[in-house]
């Protein structure tokens, strides 16, 4: 029997062996605080690849040192960081998966001893520092940093690049009227608030012709914030610029209460897919193979991003295959142990 979850998916010239994506999740494990990959990262990502994930996405990787969430984040702001990332993508490829990287700038949510930077001098909450409002030169330099990071990603051997435009980090801060109070060409109207991301996408496209994803927060969960309908407009512009897939998350641009339940963000992937006619990824409390298969069968998304469930079990694809009754081909090293994986569920 055929299952969509385990069917190939092609984006441009990259074919994923299945629809299961390892969602980018910060590990805060660059122990020397220099942005470098460590042995932990090789094991962490290589294990998920061996577990038969179709696309392993490296966590939010800072395009500038001041763009880290913490001082133990991975970085891609210098050429000396390429080698470790290349080792990581090689590990991923050698274990049968494609490799992606999420390029990021934390903006006002950077928790470092140095200044944080944002579109406006508004802190995320009363616990965090007031950020420095970026001037136009700093905006230009940050756009350039994303472009250089994309070029380094290419040299590091990634197959897919994702821009982190969600969860209240810098790109998201420019998009949302809750965090962007500028009165110049980067603030005010939706077109102006989109300008920063537009310039980043244009800059990345100059050096990268592979698949390009953007992660969005499709709902600010605030009466004066953005909704999924606002993102229909934004993602329409992204599509015009050549973005291939929208990774649909939500929230975290301002403190908010969010009611979570299994698949609570799938509605956003479905809405964007239907109204913009662009490929989408569903993410958020997707924990079983049958749930993931139903999302695909209902045409609510094209890819399934799995986060915490892959932290709980790096062999989630095997568990999902067992549940669905699909015979998943194991790595040749493990073929002496065929059959179902037993679980406590």
Swiss-Prot record:
Root EC class: oxidoreductase
Catalytic activity: A + NADPH + H(+) = AH2 + NADP(+)
InterPro entries from the UniProt entry: Aldolase_TIM, NADPH_DH_bac, OxRdtase_FMN_N, YqjM-like
EC number: 1.6.99.1
Residue positions binding substrate: 28, 164-167
GO molecular function, one term: FMN binding
UniProt: FMN binding residues: 23-26, 60, 102, 215, 307-308
Pfam families, sorted: Oxidored_FMN
Biological process per Gene Ontology, one example term: response to toxic substance
Keyword entries, A-Z: Detoxification, Flavoprotein, FMN, NADP, Oxidoreductase
CDD domains: OYE_YqiM_FMN
Needed cofactors: FMN
Record note on quaternary structure: Homotetramer.
Family the entry assigns: Belongs to the NADH:flavin oxidoreductase/NADH oxidase family. NamA subfamily.
Function: Catalyzes the reduction of the double bond of an array of alpha,beta-unsaturated aldehydes and ketones. It also reduces the nitro group of nitroester and nitroaromatic compounds. It could have a role in detoxification processes.
NCBIfam families per the UniProt record, alphabetical: PRK13523.1 (NF010047)
Protein name: NADPH dehydrogenase
Species per Swiss-Prot/TrEMBL record: Bacillus mycoides (strain KBAB4) (Bacillus weihenstephanensis)
């Amino acid at each position: 029997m055929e299952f969509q979850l385990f069917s190939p998916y092609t984006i441009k010239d990259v074919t994923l062996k299945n629809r299961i994506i390892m969602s980018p999740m910060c590990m805060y494990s660059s122990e020397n605080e220099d942005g470098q990959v460590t042995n932990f990262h090789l094991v962490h990502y290589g294990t998920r690849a061996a577990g038969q994930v179709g696309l392993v996405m490296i966590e939010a990787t800072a395009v500038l040192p001041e763009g880290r969430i913490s001082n133990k984040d991975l970085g891609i702001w210098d050429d000396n960081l390429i080698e470790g990332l290349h080792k990581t993508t090689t590990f991923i490829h050698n274990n049968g998966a494609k490799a992606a990287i999420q390029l990021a700038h934390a903006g006002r949510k950077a928790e470092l001893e140095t200044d944080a930077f944002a579109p406006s001098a508004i802190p995320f909450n009363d616990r965090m520092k007031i950020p420095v409002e970026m001037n136009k030169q700093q905006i230009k330099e940050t756009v350039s940093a994303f472009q250089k990071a994309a070029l380094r990603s290419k040299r590091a051997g990634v197959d897919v690049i994702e821009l982190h435009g969600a969860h209240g980090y810098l790109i998201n801060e420019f998009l949302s009227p809750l965090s962007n109070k500028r009165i110049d060409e980067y603030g005010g109207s939706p077109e102006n608030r989109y300008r920063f991301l537009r310039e980043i996408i244009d800059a990345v496209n100059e050096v990268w012709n592979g698949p390009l994803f953007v992660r969005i927060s499709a709902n600010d969960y605030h009466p004066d914030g953005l909704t999924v309908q606002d993102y229909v407009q934004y993602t329409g512009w992204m599509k015009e610029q050549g973005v291939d897939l929208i990774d649909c998350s939500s929230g975290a641009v301002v403190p908010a209460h969010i009611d979570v339940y299994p698949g609570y963000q799938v509605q956003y992937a479905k809405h964007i897919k239907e109204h913009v006619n662009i490929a989408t990824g569903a993410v958020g409390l997707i924990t079983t193979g049958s749930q993931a298969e139903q999302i695909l069968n209902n045409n609510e998304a094209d890819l399934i991003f799995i986060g915490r469930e892959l932290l709980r079990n790096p062999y989630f694809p095997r568990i999902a295959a067992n549940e669905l009754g699909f015979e998943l081909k194991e790595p040749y090293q493990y073929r002496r142990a065929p059959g179902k994986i037993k679980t406590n569920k």
